[in-house]
Amino acid sequence: MKTKLTRIALAVTALLGTAVIQAADTEPIQPIKPPANVNLGMVELGKKLYFDPRLSKSGFISCNSCHNLSMGGTDNIPTSIGDKWQQGPINAPTVLNSSLNVAQFWDGRAADLKEQAGGPIANPGEMAFTHTLAIDVLQSIPGYVREFKQVFGTDKIDIDQVTTAIAEFEKTLVTPNSRFDQWLLGKKDALTKDELEGYKLFKDSGCVACHNGEGVGGNSFQKMGIVEPYKGNTSDGRAAVTGNDADRFNYKVPTLRNVEMTYPYFHDGAYWTLTEAVDVMGRLQLGKKFTKEENARIVAFLKTLTGEQPKFLLPILPPSSDKTPRPTPFGK
Ligand code: HEC
Ligand code: HEC
């Protein structure tokens, strides 16, 4: 009896499973999968490092300062504020779902999250530290020495372990179960009529040529300003990495997941509202001027891409010891 029921249950699951996959497969956007295969001990350690401002020269700036997980993984300002209140050159993209990206940074200069994570600690305009000093700080904190030993099995902390742990934590920062994903997975009443019409416009106008896949972006580099040039603060974009002039003004297509939370928009953070961003995209990328109503529907659709935000207890960081090098918040 029990086995028979189990078999029926399995058959039903298998059937539903295929139906779900087929429904999602015919759309250019796929639902986000919850994080799988993460090392939980490493995630906990990486979470602490992500929130630890002692990895910065000032002792004041952590990853979370610019990628605030209470605010969609961004800082919600046009360009970031770094060490000594320096104004950064470019808008901070969200860390949410960044594990789905083809590469990291607007110009894709880091291949993956691990490579990316070493950058900001040593960037003079961001955390302004050195990897050696960051390791000295961690090695002086007994709580960290214990935890690194548990996770990596050695008494000696190095930058490779630090970036590995941060990247592992970042893998958990995905946002499944948005209303749009529920719709993709078969819940037909998850979207309103306006939102569905917005999605249809998004597809039929050609937005999906660049914003597609699980991340609704993040998987290719494209020119900003195909039909009309972008008038904002332009940098070289992808050409800075490839040295190829054809890649000028090419940027990694940003993910549109949680886009309602990640304002202001574009690499220079010049536009604050989705209404403006959709208008700019329509005109510059597709040569299309949307009516007010069309624009509002696309915006309504974009807002259905907000998923479940990562939930966890705020990590409590191990205290410094008498030997911990002191922060230098005001220069020196
Ligand atoms: C002072 C602000 C600041 C701090 C601190 C900071 N970042 Fe960033 N982060 C940025 C900016 C700005 C960019 C975009 C830079 C670029 O593309 O050239 C970025 C890019 C990224 C990206 C790439 C996302 C994408 O879609 O390309 C990831 C991932 C990331 N940061 C993670 C981290 C981690 C992990 C830390 C801590 C070790 C950190 N950041 C610290 C501002 C900051
Ligand atoms: C040819 C490729 C392409 C097409 C087509 C395209 N986009 Fe984009 N989209 C991009 C790129 C590249 C960026 C980043 C540009 C930058 O920051 O300079 C972007 C940025 C955005 C942003 C800002 C996201 C952020 O976090 O800054 C929104 C919103 C957006 N697109 C929506 C749309 C909509 C809606 C359409 C259809 C009307 C569309 N896009 C069509 C490539 C494209």
What residue spans do the PLM features occupy?
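Periplasmic c-type cytochrome electron-transfer domains
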Residues: K4-R7, I21-K332
